Amino acid sequence: MKKIVFTGGGTVGHVTLNLLLMPKFIEDGWEVHYIGDKRGIEHQEILKSGLDVTFHSIATGKLRRYFSWQNMLDVFKVGWGIVQSLFIMLRLRPQTLFSKGGFVSVPPVIAARVSGVPVFIHESDLSMGLANKIAYKFATKMYSTFEQASSLSKVEHVGAVTKVSDQKNPEPDELVDIQSHFNHKLPTVLFVGGSAGARVFNQLVTDHKKELTERYNIINLTGDSSLNELSQNLFRVDYVTDLYQPLMELADIVVTRGGANTIFELLAIAKLHVIVPLGREASRGDQIENAAYFVKKGYAEDLQESDLTLDSLEEKLSHLLSHKEDYQAKMKASTELKSLADFYQLLKKDLS
């Protein structure tokens, strides 16, 4: 039986594509393994998926671009993670390793290359993260969501592979209940803060609940169960799975962070959106770059977190609603999306 090892983690964005691809390989008779951190979100997501995947936990350390005494400790963690991954590779002898990035992916990628296993990696953002910059040196091939510099000879631009489904499923009962609390004469605004929510969105909704619910139906994915609430024109919930796409479709506008996975999902369904990227003080600036790209393409509006107020947000919402057809036409004309089926066939071809 053919074997494939997946890796990637730290955030849902570094796991999502793996979760989409693994069932395809399982259906085609592959034995699927995953290398990650048992304390990480990758382990949680695989357990929730119920997929027949063998999980191997390794030591992992954070790769920092700045000086920290923790770098010394993490060097040893990464080194031990490489040794652990090497033993896993030598024991399994897989046909390939597929990496979606994140700090936990570096040891398996290095170990795979050392043990002669082909390495395929995927980069979602406009600029490569530190983990994938390291991984690229050991990769057989990298697939990218955005166009990359021509000097990167191992990169193939494939566009975004999203988890948005074309299949229309019956409305969940919970969605019907939510809609019964909404005023259908008002536009619906969905706040999406990533897998852990976004405190800035949560605070905005909390501070301006009255004003917001007078003018909009508000859906707030918070990442915090203490904020859960269903009331007139307001639905706040910490986490959703089956409700995710129905809520996306229900919304007239989405206010989101600038993670590539989420914004390309919105592009795939031509959904109006305002991007509030994580600032450089909290990230390497990849979300700012992603947001600027989407604004330049005419897909979205952006708003820096430092400028986010009720008034500034309402100005963006009003602009999007009044120019809805223009934004949607540009999104529908995009050629930057790839279906899961097409990407899977491309990957299988490259593996052969």
Swiss-Prot record:
GO MF term set: undecaprenyldiphospho-muramoylpentapeptide beta-N-acetylglucosaminyltransferase activity
Segments passing through the bilayer: none
Membrane-related topology note: Peripheral membrane protein
A Gene Ontology cellular-component term: plasma membrane
Pathway: Cell wall biogenesis; peptidoglycan biosynthesis
Keyword annotations of the record: Cell cycle, Cell division, Cell membrane, Cell shape, Cell wall biogenesis/degradation, Glycosyltransferase, Membrane, Peptidoglycan synthesis, Transferase
Record's catalysed reaction(s): Mur2Ac(oyl-L-Ala-gamma-D-Glu-L-Lys-D-Ala-D-Ala)-di-trans,octa-cis-undecaprenyl diphosphate + UDP-N-acetyl-alpha-D-glucosamine = beta-D-GlcNAc-(1->4)-Mur2Ac(oyl-L-Ala-gamma-D-Glu-L-Lys-D-Ala-D-Ala)-di-trans,octa-cis-undecaprenyl diphosphate + UDP + H(+)
Primary location: membrane
Residues that hold UDP-N-acetyl-alpha-D-glucosamine according to the record: S195, Q287
Compartment(s) where it occurs, according to its Swiss-Prot or TrEMBL record: Cell membrane
UniProt key word Cell division: yes
GO biological process, one term: peptidoglycan biosynthetic process
E.C. numbers: 2.4.1.227
Protein family: Belongs to the glycosyltransferase 28 family. MurG subfamily.
UniProt function note: Cell wall formation. Catalyzes the transfer of a GlcNAc subunit on undecaprenyl-pyrophosphoryl-MurNAc-pentapeptide (lipid intermediate I) to form undecaprenyl-pyrophosphoryl-MurNAc-(pentapeptide)GlcNAc (lipid intermediate II).
Name the UniProt record assigns to this protein: UDP-N-acetylglucosamine--N-acetylmuramyl-(pentapeptide) pyrophosphoryl-undecaprenol N-acetylglucosamine transferase
Organism: Streptococcus pneumoniae (strain 70585)
Source taxonomy: Bacteria, Bacillati, Bacillota, Bacilli, Lactobacillales
